[in-house]
């Protein structure tokens, strides 16, 4: 952590930032890439501002010249009031995703400890943060007010916490803002501790800028100037030469223009005065958006010359009037006002400015106002009841089944011109992860019952049992024309808590309470079904293979082992119908902390569990209860002979639409491969396997299937293999390859006998060398001849590419393999095929003959038990997922620095804010070594809440560093997932926050949502909404 407040995250050097899915704000590019902002993914779309705004007068100003003594004195005084704000929104809420960022604020009441900043900094949802003063003193801040519409909010700090400098405040002088006024913007520009930008006010009557799909201000004018502020300057004071704050920095352009937009301080000043007096900040609304339009446009809308003359006479300097832009359905003005109405009077008062309109509405909550408008040249007078703006601004949310919900906000309703009602999904995760989109859904009905608001939704969810499948009806707020219908699986076992969070403006926290215990799952009952028939397939044995396929859906409640997804679906092959055994790709079922459901004959859905995970060859064995399936499921016949290159076969696979396809083809190649390692974060990959490719285009379209002979015997599985993430597109590569069935038999035969294999493996990754290379590296002519005789089809040996980092109980010794060794024999058998390496599975020690540095050597090679390589425990601490280094980490690193490895982190968490990145190792807490998870949990349990502590960490590239972090038990209590075969789920969850969770069950908070977790490094950003 740099002293100036900028976060410098330590990570693997080659890692990349993974873009989120739906943009919410749009920020200025830095170094040719879009900078993520307060809720802004790196791939944010840029939106155009209305053309009218682009024609505004701009007075370009270059860098500040040598300031006059007056300006120097002013700046010296102002900087003592400016603070750098470091903050997080702990979970997605309303228009913003969970995030961590930096911004600016300034003290407006030194005695009471009030800081003025932007509303998009204070956040609509749960906030935690701190501020740093000019002398680098730090103190916590909490929100006391965020405006429902306008882009300002007020934070509170404890003035007594600042001991080494005299606190000063800036006076708010909104009336001092004038065209031509020279100004300075003093703030945390581009993440720097202090930047001073100069400019000149060019406009006072600009409409509020549109930032796209995220939070946008409206119903106010903005001030325009050329100051070239950027990310991090949000909330900066705009000061004049007298040292008074005359505006608030709010946003800027994303196209490189030096234009900035400032919020006038009239409404912030009023709110501050109310808070000082201990009064609520009343906010009124008739749910109508107004915009300023110049007189020429108003005339085209029907403004009569008489009224124009009256307005110009009353306000000689006015050039525009207020025109209705959006009237929300079901609002107070619905059916009374129309879009395009030109506002003339309110309560008999001629009115052309937003400020006066706000004054009237804010003082008339619960009352009626009279509006006179012109519509097509005709005077129309209407009466509207003024509603409470706070009442249609959500101040609570509910988390259930992994998702987060609240009432639709006025912000979202205004943006899409819809009624301000409905249940909004602000965190589409868990059971409610709909169409792979993070947020934006409106739930219309659940289980065939309407959910018009959050209360109705909550009552419906209380009655739905765990593991039930219910029909939901929904629309996305960006496409309200299309109504979707889906069946969702209600998860109340990994997410047992149904909780409500309510904003508490006294404490600045959101108070959580449990709403209802989960309804127990109903006992599954057997069901009947028939399989489809493959028409046009001449071989009956081939057509019958359809009875051996099942669809497999795997959902992970927590990101482990660097796996990038929270849900994956594919197909598995039934290898024993009587016992319910299915083999499936490990790219679909990566680890056993998961929910697995299989679908038989596209009709029967039953649960399954992990029986076996192969450490090297990319397959998982799962098991379901066959007594629940009354369908003619057939065990696939697996070939005991390896398929050969050039051999004809029949490809049967499933395309992207889950439709089965069949094609006659031939094997084009069988090559020994290892799936490329992922550079940004190690994760499971297949190594040391013979990959089969076939001569059909369907092979690239199908992720799962089989190669089958005309006799119906399965010769190979067709599997998907998770590969590397491409640096350019940030997408994960999947390989589709065949895997010969004889390689399965040593494992499947034991499992069918009721024995779970405990394999042992050599601690290495190898690759093929041809005889020309082997000869150069010292392999004798005698051995080259033996290779040719032993494997006529492929003359090859295996060279050690990488030796894995061994488990702690294994120490380096002279009988260990080294990179570059060529393996000749194991236990006296010449090794020229991958299948011949299988002898390592059951041997603790192998007698090996190798060639090293041109010399033949005999070694006693110890093998490693694979059960020690699978993850059996995870600790979630301050938003970071910690585990023992999994197998992929050991494959890619040469030394384990500790057994406390950061596998993932939640956005908006302390881990994210302070830069503790995935792939880091934690070696000590407050100077006490923590070599394993037990010692880590013991030490961090001693740390009080809201207290700083030190973590000593080491990056994947062996760079040691120290991170200071503040503990936050309110939003991020420590919890654990521990593998426990005695539990129904195979795991138990434990909360270490016993005071609030006496049942020991981890709360289902949005910060444990795997879709809000990053398993790779992603930069922490500065907040600055911008438009193009």
Swiss-Prot record:
Signal peptide: none annotated. Its main location: nucleus. Its EC number is 3.4.21.-. Residues 305-377, 876-957 form the PDZ domain. Keywords: Apoptosis, Hydrolase, Nucleus, Protease, Repeat, Serine protease. It is found in: Nucleus. The active site is at residues 120, 151, 233. Pfam families: PDZ_1, PDZ_6, Trypsin_2. Transmembrane segments: none annotated. Coiled coil: none annotated. SUPFAM superfamilies: PDZ domain-like, Trypsin-like serine proteases. Residues 1-46, 989-1028 are annotated as: Disordered. Belongs to the peptidase S1C family. Nuclear serine protease which mediates apoptosis. This is Pro-apoptotic serine protease nma111.
